[in-house]
Amino acid sequence: LDDANIDYVGVMAFPSRKIVGDVTEEYTIKVINAVRDYADRFAIIGGVEVNELSIDEVKYWLNKQYESGISAIKIHPVHHWVKPNAYRPEEQNLKQLELVYQFAEDHRLPVYIHTGTSMAPKARNKYGDPIFIDDVSVDFPKLTIIMAHMGRPIWMSTAFQLVRIRPNIYADLSSIPPKKMLEYVPRLAEISDKAIYGSDYPGPGVYDIKANLQEFLKIPIPNDSIKKIVDDNPRKILKPLSRNR
């Protein structure tokens, strides 16, 4: 991190039974404990697999992860096989998911929601459409929502419009190759107040955090827009472990 001139990074540490196997809510706690001595360098994003747990279990794990110091919550519809708006009565009426959003709103935790496709063999990509997040934005207006990957590669226009019209929806740019960023998001500068840099390391095609960041810094948009995306906005939204409970 020092070599890349990065103060701290966000680490996704959420359960994934269907895709990875025996990776449960306890995994979040293990990751937090592993980096506790470097709490100023890491922000841990936890989560619960809402369609695998009872309401009481969801409450238990949310509280335990919060007390341990999570900086945000991650929902992965494509890997968890659930719509982001599945709590709605006309959808699945999944109270466990509603509880997650309410908890995050009450505790001022941002929520990352995966959008776009996944190459995982058991992924259900139909759940990656960002339009389902629109309901969440309306129903939880005080919740900070971060659309991970901005719907890439097939729903990016939908994601862009949601960032523009919904004040509590932000765009996470991770996993979009910096060299192709303006092909995917040609009007990136217009949403620089609501966009957040990310690498998705060690995800597909991302082999080095420093190299990825350096490529991003070369994107031909105004310098103040770059600074907002790589520095100002992440610091505002995602706090390191040392700043939490």
Question: Over which residues does each language-model region extend?
Answer:
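N-terminal cationic-hydrophobic initiation segments that often serve targeting/anchoring roles
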Residues: L1, V35-A39, S137, V163, ...
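Mid-to-C-terminal alpha-helical segments outside catalytic/metal-binding sites
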Residues: L1-Y8, S68, I191-K194, P204-R245
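Active-site gating/metal-coordination segments in enzymes
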Residues: D7-Y8, S16-M119
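Active-site neighborhood of phospho(di)ester-bond hydrolases with catalytic His/Asp-centered motifs
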Residues: G10-M12, I45-G47, K74, I145-A148, ...
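Conserved strand-to-helix beginnings and helix N-cap segments that scaffold or border functional pockets
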Residues: G21-E25, I55-K59, P130, S157-A159, ...
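Alpha-helical elements of Rossmann-like donor-binding domains used by nucleotide-donor carbohydrate transfer enzymes
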Residues: K30-N33, Y60-K64, L99, F132-D135, ...
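Short glycine-enriched loops at secondary-structure junctions
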Residues: V50, R152, P202-G203
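Catalytic pocket-lining loop regions of alpha/beta-barrel enzymes
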Residues: Y87-I196, N244
